[in-house]
Amino acid sequence: MFFKNDSDRGKNAPERGIVPLLPLRDIIVFPHMVSQLFVGRERSIAALDEAMNRGKEIFLAAQRNAKTNDPTPDDIFGVGSVGAIMQLLRLPDGTVKVLIEGKRRARIRRYVQSDAYFLIEYDEIVESSVASVEVEALMRSVQSTFEMYVKLNKKIQPEVLMAVQAIDEASRLADTIIANLPTIKLTDRQALLEMEEPQKRLERLIELMQAEIEILQVEKKIRSRVKKQMEKTQKEYYLNEQMQAIQKELGGGERDEFKNEIQEIEEALKTKRMSKEAAAKVKKELKKLKMMHPTSAEATVVRNYIDWILELPWYDKSEERYDLVEAERILDEDHYGLKKIKERILEYLAVQALTKKLKGPVLCFVGPPGVGKTSLAKSIARATGRKFVRLSLGGVRDEAEIRGHRRTYIGALPGKLIQSLKKVGTNNPVFLLDEVDKMSTDFRGDPAAALLEVLDPEQNHTFNDHYLDLDYDLSDVMFITTANTLSGIPVPLQDRMEVIQLSGYTEFEKLNIAVKYLVPRQRKECGLEDVSLDFTEGALRTIIHHYTKESGVRSLEREIASVCRKVARRVVSDGKEKPIEVVAKSIPKYLGVPKYRLGRREERDEVGLVNGLAVTNVGGDLLPAEATVVPGKGKLVITGLLEKGMEESGHAAMSYVRSRLDRLGLEADVYQKVDVHIHFPDFVRKDGPSAGVTMVTALVSSLMKVPVRRDLAMTGEITLRGRVMPIGGLKEKLLAAHRGGIATVILPKENRKDLRDVPRRVLKALRLVLVEHVDDVLREALILPDAYAIFGPPKGVLEYRDGELVTEAAPVKAPPAAAGEPTPAAPPGA
């Protein structure tokens, strides 16, 4: 029943009426929308009954909160739609099924009654219906957008799209579309219902549909991806089932083999002794492996990982020997000389025998090539009953070589440490890290940093390899490292090691090594054990002097091997086994022309030529220094492939000489009239300050035009005050002097403590003069009649003859001068 006041409104004036209200939960009925509702609340059923009595019209409005069972006027939106009941059916359970069609928008004016049911008075909302090109374009855009939505949302029937495309009224188009968008939120639907202008309603509708389209497109992609994955999984399952059926027909095949492998792993896990962490890891990986297909790539990775853990020697040890007498016998049997080194090794083994632990410094053998560093490590392994394993670090630049690759990488493996321990089969071998000074660094990491943990006794019991990702105990491993020089080893790594220097062998030691070890070994390797072959001492000396230039004996063995091969050929060709003696004069026939000129002293005393001493990569050597003076303007030139340190030493020598011109009897401005050139022959890089006294002597000899003794060599750093400072490598330098035929060696007094490292045979063959000042060097070296008058008597000079200390330094008669050369005078009072 409608109450209309026609006198108050015109033709298009809004209607007003009083009708029952039906509160709706989670649904909004739009005009032109037919909805089927199930009504169960008593007040709502009463409202329907009243509507049937009032001409079947009812007001439909949504609740603000769907969970409210007994709403009040404040719980109901103020805008809804007036609808007509098309059909009403009472169900057996008391529920009423009703079919209602929305007719027009309306706003609640007031509540007339709210007791048994809601009775309200409403005002109709009159919509503007202005037709324009803009509205027409907007309608087309809405229809096009809805078409896209329908294509993505398969729940909407195609007939709905056809009906929407036939609508030519903006308001009805908007209401029809919103009625068919079930995913739009209730608040957005209510807002569209309250919009009076169709144009704004269409614009908002486009925004909502575009947002829904984006969501539907993402859902479509997800469904497509899931579908493909399911199809792939189903396909794999189907193929696997087929494969299993085929294998079953053929007698089990791969699956049975896979089961056998798992059983073997389970049995090995029961018997293998390993850490609790490792056992738990194997069980976890085995559980994963059982769920995998045998031929999958992941199964192969897991199997390899389990194999590595099971094959490592977690608690497998070699039986160790602590017999020092036997250890000393083995060291003496394998190596000649090296007395100090052997004593240190025996001390190391004695401490281990008492403590039964390896905690202590790691030994680092430093020395030139071929002196026996690697073979010493092998002898230690033999003496202690441990197995021996060697890892060369030369050229290693990747941290993963030490720590391994993580399992995420294809083809990942443990580091070389773990690989070597698996190969050797015990967890207490003698582990030689060879050429530790030859490692380098790049973008993949610093292997030297990775070794810090390995060589630290406080940390290596929990060494963690990246591949295993487990703690492995390295504390029982006896690590030994080798290097040619300390310069290539980082300081933190040096701090974890005890450095043992292995100097070069003397000529006497090389002779004995050749006779006792090298010649017998090469005779055996060349099949000459039954042939009477003898190397004379002269032949071996010739090979040492003219065919090798090294501190060790590696090249010496190669040359002996070359002689033995030529002898073997001669024996096979002649078919006779006559005694063969290799003598000095026959060596060029076997080895060709001499390769090296022995670093020996000159045959004449010459001006500006001084024998210096140096340490090279192959041991000690004579380092002759030449100085010459030419007319010029005081320029100093130093040549000979020198490093910066040696050039600075040359400038210091020149400054000292200039400060002593008056004492030397030279004009004060003589250096301004001449250029001085100091040269060090031989194309070998030279560095260090130990040639300071050599350059001072060469400069003074050239400026004074006084010759230097040819049978004398010297070494020492100088200061601007003329003090002679200590140097390094004394043993190697004295070996070189002895080898080069030098009779007297001048060296810093502060190096007296280092003489204990020099072989007794060498000390007895040399006269040693230990000085503190350059004046003592010049007095001893220059062949000068009035040397004592110029440089004064010796002060604090020590002299060794035949290896014994002489209380006072006595003058030594210089070697006979060549024809036409001055003869040195005896000192005053002699």
Swiss-Prot record:
One of its GO terms (biological process) is protein quality control for misfolded or incompletely synthesized proteins. The keyword Hydrolase applies. Residues 19-213 form the Lon N-terminal domain. GO terms for molecular function: ATP binding; ATP hydrolysis activity; ATP-dependent peptidase activity; sequence-specific DNA binding; serine-type endopeptidase activity. It is found in: Cytoplasm. InterPro entries: AAA+_ATPase, ATPase_AAA_core, Lon_bac, Lon_bac/euk-typ, Lon_lid, Lon_proteolytic, Lon_Prtase, Lon_prtase_N. SUPFAM superfamilies: P-loop containing nucleoside triphosphate hydrolases, PUA domain-like, Ribosomal protein S5 domain 2-like. Signal peptide: none annotated. Residues 604-784 form the Lon proteolytic domain. Residues 811-823 have a biased composition (Low complexity). Induction: By heat shock. GO terms for cellular component: cytoplasm. Keywords: ATP-binding, Cytoplasm, Hydrolase, Nucleotide-binding, Protease, Serine protease, Stress response. Homohexamer. Organized in a ring with a central cavity. ATP-dependent serine protease that mediates the selective degradation of mutant and abnormal proteins as well as certain short-lived regulatory proteins. Required for cellular homeostasis and for survival from DNA damage and developmental changes induced by stress. Degrades polypeptides processively to yield small peptide fragments that are 5 to 10 amino acids long. Binds to DNA in a double-stranded, site-specific manner. Belongs to the peptidase S16 family. NCBIfam families: lon (TIGR00763), PRK10787.1 (NF008053). This is Lon protease 3. It comes from Sorangium cellulosum (strain So ce56) (Polyangium cellulosum (strain So ce56)).
